[in-house]
Amino acid sequence: MSFGYQVLGFGSGGGGVVYEVTYLVVAGGAGGGAGGGGGAGGFRTSEDSSPMEIEAGDYTITVGSGSGPVPGNDSSPRAGNSVFNTITSTGGGGSGYGNPEEDGGSGGVQNGLGNTPPVTPSQGNNGGPQIQSGGGGASQAGQDNSPAGGAGGNGRDSSVSGSSVEYAGGGGGGGYIPNTAPGPARDGGGAGGSRTG
């Protein structure tokens, strides 16, 4: 699911006036499932390339929502995409046990692919290799720490808002064996859960 907002207005509309816009577009992060951490939403910014040139007018921005956790061994679905003009960041890939990995901006566990669909520069990284690994983040793949939960992949910093803030970290994995430590969160991702029995 995504939400649309008409939030940008430059000038009175039309007239051929061109503006340079600095942007940061981060998609929704995915929920975890059956021990694995969810992948972060895709991270795309003009700081990696150059400002976007757009004409005066109204623009709709779509903000991708996160996907929640799921019970049992099912995979959490991919989260929502975020869109600004020609820039689309893909929602993070969900995680589950014994189910196909979810690809996305950053991938879910069991090697879910990040940067899907591929863009340059990359919008994210792969999920960790095991069911209790962390989800991928904007600057690092999800980590494995078997049998404890793996850390989510690191996110990235952006100064678009005027100060440096970390975004798009992967979710931590849950311990596969009861009473093992969960994986820590990274840069906006959620920490893993604990299994007690």
Where would I find each of the regions flagged by the language model?
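Low-complexity, glycine/proline-biased repetitive segments and flexible coils/loops
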Residues: 2-197
